[in-house]
Amino acid sequence: MSDYLVIVESPAKAKTIERYLGKKYKVKASMGHVRDLPKSQMGVDIEQNFEPKYITIRGKGPVLKELKTAAKKAKKVYLAADPDREGEAIAWHLAHSLDLDLNSDCRVVFNEITKDAIKESFKHPRMINMDLVDAQQARRILDRLVGYKISPILWKKVKKGLSAGRVQSVALRLIIDREKEINDFKPEEYWTIDGTFLKGQETFEASFFGKNGKKLPLNSEADVKEILSQLKGNQYTVEKVTKKERKRNPALPFTTSTLQQEAARKLNFRAKKTMMIAQQLYEGIDLGREGTVGLITYMRTDSTRISNTAVDEAAAFIDQTYGKEFLGGKRKPAKKNENAQDAHEAIRPTSVLRKPSELKAVLGRDQMRLYKLIWERFVASQMAPAVLDTMSVDLTNNGLTFRANGSKVKFSGFMKVYVEGKDDQMEEKDRMLPDLQEGDTVLSKDIEPEQHFTQPPPRYTEARLVKTLEERGIGRPSTYAPTLDTIQRRGYVALDNKRFVPTELGQIVLDLIMEFFPEIINVEFTAKMERDLDHVEEGNTEWVKIIDNFYTDFEKRVKKAESEMKEVEIEPEYAGEDCELCSSPMVYKMGRYGKFLACSNFPDCRNTKPIVKQIGVKCPSCGEGNIVERKSKKKRVFYGCDRYPDCEFVSWDKPIERKCPKCGKMLVEKKLKKGIQVQCVECDYKEEPQK
């Protein structure tokens, strides 16, 4: 019989930890929360200081029974749920369900699942932190009050299945506000003049800067013609050469937010997928002889702190692998305040000695890609800054200035290991300039004016929305991925080219919430609520006070909405074609991944089909069908014949109407970093890339 029972959330975690602790310990899984508010009722007694009425979650009865039996046999029970508010709440619910002494040292926390970390954590058990529990409970009750009061009104006035929440409503507002900015945007004309210049046999690029040393904007073609008329000949004098050495510091190691952003940029992962794979890496991977080991630290964190042990291991690794000159400078020590929040670390590999290249045999493709990203980011964060030599050159002709900028990596530093996703294209090539001295003469080879128009702000990607939510203080590490998932499942937004587009339904719901519950979608109000919850976690505020302050005004608004909110009828958008199964009109519907066609006779007829987008090109294979744009299971655009499966023509590149002038075969548009280039699929014919 085992002397000690340890309870964690998942079987994978249990298996790993049990091996580290030895025969005296039995580790079992609670499979997440065992108690929660009931789904069939609000479950909050408003008259009794918002007292929650918890019940055992459906299906968890057998799990609890097994845990109770094991707990009675054990000398001591340890609760080792995750090291955050949610984990503390799970431990508290388990303690209640198993009749454990809440004043006993039954709580064990760790940031990584490795032998040393687990052994060390069991040397320092503590009481359940009720401040953390209260913060989680306050969030849960707030979300229940908002959801349980507003959602039924939306069901009655708009349609079934809708929901409203504090964080999801603000996220929806950000997306819709951005769409309004885009629609209201008025493009403004501007021009640039770019030149190609010669110094001996070397060419370089420079752009028009201004006149008589002052920057001069070009707002029209008339402005450009005026400048071109003032240029005299093709000789330019090098008037000013500025050389500087610039340092570029590495990014900090990952938090939950920055991991989700970078995984979206570099790996094309959705936030939900990133967290799922990170959970696998945290809970443990079977490494063969070494057994099951957690490869990364806990993945729900907003801290960039690194333990001294991890810093020292990274320093030794960098010194040995890359050399002393690649070591980072003076490192900040770990925080001394070891409360629950400060005790969190950044997301990092549990050991830098487990290099990604050595784990290929034991990791799946996506696991490997995410681990490599985390490993490289952490190692780079402990390395020396990169050093760049920059050079700025002013060329003059009749008082007009053209400016050339160049840079060269003098010392790669951390860039030897990792460069942030948004900067990859910028840093791929050095922008070199010839050896130019003040007073030199250079010749212009080509002067090209080009018209431009200012662009509206871009729609939000998942990465950008997560970053904005974090910057505005909305939500916490555990809420970003579920929030993005919810607004898509409800049909409030759809993804178009990996960017969020609000739907008509999303606009209707937001308009109603803005009219009747303005504080719910107020960014500053929601951010203040998050800060208040943090104050509860820190033990500085009572959770009941926060909810009471919120509910007094909220209840009045609920009553007003119930009596004054008008029913909204969403008119169907007809597609102009009939259902091939029942002859009813087909209508456009918005799903999680965008628009699709559905029969208006639903639910009697459940016919649906994707919207086919023709590109106006005949199929080059069969000559009968038309080429249409389609999407793969991974949402990648490709092109195929609309006679499929009779014709199986497919192409990743977009076919065009013109034929190759050399061989008469199909031409396609290929996307390159320089722009879109027309190429022949058979011969070597290529055209100049177009931006």
UniProtKB/Swiss-Prot annotation:
SUPFAM superfamilies: Prokaryotic type I DNA topoisomerase, Zinc beta-ribbon. One of its GO terms (biological process) is DNA topological change. Mg(2+) binds at residues 9, 82. InterPro entries: Topo_IA, Topo_IA_2, Topo_IA_AS, Topo_IA_cen, Topo_IA_cen_sub1, Topo_IA_cen_sub2, Topo_IA_cen_sub3, Topo_IA_core_domain. The keyword Metal-binding applies. Residues 3-114 form the Toprim domain. Releases the supercoiling and torsional tension of DNA, which is introduced during the DNA replication and transcription, by transiently cleaving and rejoining one strand of the DNA duplex. Introduces a single-strand break via transesterification at a target site in duplex DNA. The scissile phosphodiester is attacked by the catalytic tyrosine of the enzyme, resulting in the formation of a DNA-(5'-phosphotyrosyl)-enzyme intermediate and the expulsion of a 3'-OH DNA strand. The free DNA strand then undergoes passage around the unbroken strand, thus removing DNA supercoils. It catalyses: ATP-independent breakage of single-stranded DNA, followed by passage and rejoining. Monomer. Interacts with the RNA polymerase core. It comes from Bacillus subtilis (strain 168). HAMAP family: Topoisom_1_prok. Keywords: DNA-binding, Isomerase, Magnesium, Metal-binding, Repeat, Topoisomerase, Zinc, Zinc-finger. The gene is topA. The record marks 33, 139-140, 143, 148, 155, 300, 490 as: Interaction with DNA. One of its GO terms (molecular function) is zinc ion binding. Residues 129-558 form the Topo IA-type catalytic domain. This is DNA topoisomerase 1. PANTHER family: DNA TOPOISOMERASE, DNA TOPOISOMERASE, TYPE IA, CORE. The keyword Repeat applies.
